[in-house]
Regions:
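Flexible, gly/proline-biased loop segments at the beginnings
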Residues: 1-135, 174, 299, 303, ...
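Residues in well-ordered beta-strands of folded domains
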Residues: 116-118, 129, 148, 212, ...
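Active-site and NAD+-binding cores of ADP-ribose-processing enzymes
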Residues: 120-176
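Extended, charged amphipathic alpha-helical segments
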Residues: 2-14, 18, 153-286, 290-300, ...
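Short N-terminal helix-initiation segments at or just after the protein's N-terminus
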Residues: 52-63, 90-93, 145-159, 185-188, ...
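Short amphipathic alpha-helical surface micro-motifs
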Residues: 95-99, 108-110, 128, 144-147, ...
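Short, charged N-terminal helix-start/capping segments
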Residues: 24-52, 139-147, 190-212, 245, ...
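Short, well-ordered loop/turn elements at secondary-structure boundaries
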Residues: 109-111, 121-124, 141-142, 205-206, ...
Length: 346
């Protein structure tokens, strides 16, 4: 046979048939991945969307209001700053101490604060009234503002009657954006950890278990009764015992397999501490001024020195911002007394 006629036959693919088994590998996840930064980025292109006759803020004011009380270390520094500012504020005939408290709190929470000037018949200002920043919107037309607590019935303010104090943003110039925006993820994580631990205790201090039964001696009625008893043991009053009678059952006929031991494996304390540090770093309030106990033996240091540094670095700039109303009114409406610790140290 010539070499040209010698052809190499292809090898047959060996197949193995194991009966009628059609087992296949399957990969699955318990939940879909959650994107952290995706669709919300398009809002940076929109800046402030026009809604009817006013601009909507770039950040949801309702969301900021809900997040305000989401975590202890988020609201406590804001209240602390507000309380110190109110204690140093000298009341004026146009602006009471209570109205100033609302004016300062809105600026600290929303980075926007609005004061409405009420005029007499001669055109003079008789009172400055704070308008809730959560519902106040800047109008599309110049020097116009709207109070929008309901889209069905918006209220327009008189032209040139609203003073708008804002913390400047890098993406738009219509509304202010809070400085603490970067720490909101830590605030929400802190809240989620607290809510999870609360549900964990309400569930009977366990993460759940699998009740495995392989004993043929049990009847369907017994299984249904056990299932009903387990359902009723969840929630309030969950610390109760269950009785199961199986005279012809096997030793391992009933097994309780715990899913996880949360008390030993979760990172509740670590999450709380890390998120607390993030929030305090963003708010720039010394921990000793908020009543936080130190974890080390050395403590946080001298509280008076920390208070003086806080007054110089944080309170003084806030006071300067809040006093911008004086230039708009043409009168010294907002004025502060000296901080006692700075006077005593001077």
């Amino acid at each position: 046979m010539s070499k040209r006629n010698r052809k190499t036959r292809p090898a047959k693919v060996a197949t193995t048939m194991a009966g009628n088994s059609t087992a296949q590998a399957e990969a699955f996840t318990f939940d879909a991945p959650i994107p952290m930064m995706d669709r919300r980025d398009i809002l940076d292109y929109l800046e402030c969307a026009v809604m009817d006759r006013w601009y909507e803020p770039p950040v949801s004011f309702s969301g900021l209001a809900k997040s305000f009380r989401a975590a202890v270390h988020h609201s406590s520094p804001i209240y602390m700053k507000r309380n110190v500012l109110v204690s140093l504020f000298e009341p004026h005939r146009l602006l009471s101490k209570q109205d100033f408290s609302r004016y300062a709190l809105d600026f600290l929470v929303f980075a926007n604060s609005f004061l409405e000037a009420r005029y007499n018949r001669l055109g003079g200002i008789i009172k400055l009234v704070p308008s809730p920043a959560k519902y106040t919107r800047r109008g599309v037309e110049a020097d116009t503002y709207w109070y929008v607590s309901s889209y069905a019935n918006p209220h327009p303010f008189e032209a040139n009657s609203i003073f708008h104090l804002l913390d400047p943003d890098i993406n738009q110039e219509i509304y202010g954006v809070p400085e603490y925006l970067a720490s909101l993820n830590s605030t929400w994580l802190n809240e989620a950890a607290t809510l999870f631990r609360r549900k964990y205790y309400l569930n009977g201090s366990h993460a759940g278990f699998i009740l495995y039964m392989n004993d043929a001696a049990h009847k369907q009625e017994d299984i249904d009764a056990l299932r009903k008893a387990l359902k009723e043991s969840k929630g309030p009053g969950n610390f109760r015992n269950l009785f199961m009678y199986a005279p012809a059952g096997k030793k391992d006929g009933i097994q309780v397999i715990p899913l996880a031991e949360v008390a030993a494996k979760d990172e509740f304390a670590s999450i709380k501490n890390v998120t607390r540090d993030d929030q305090l770093a963003m708010q720039r309030v010394p921990p000793q001024l908020m009543g936080i106990l130190p974890n080390n033996t050395g403590g946080f240091g001298d509280v008076e020195k920390a208070a003086r540094v806080f007054a110089i670095n944080e309170l003084a700039p806030l006071q300067e911002r809040l006093m911008e109303i004086n230039d708009w009114v043409g009168e010294e409406v907002v004025r502060f007394r000296p901080y006692e610790l700075l006077v005593s140290a001077g």
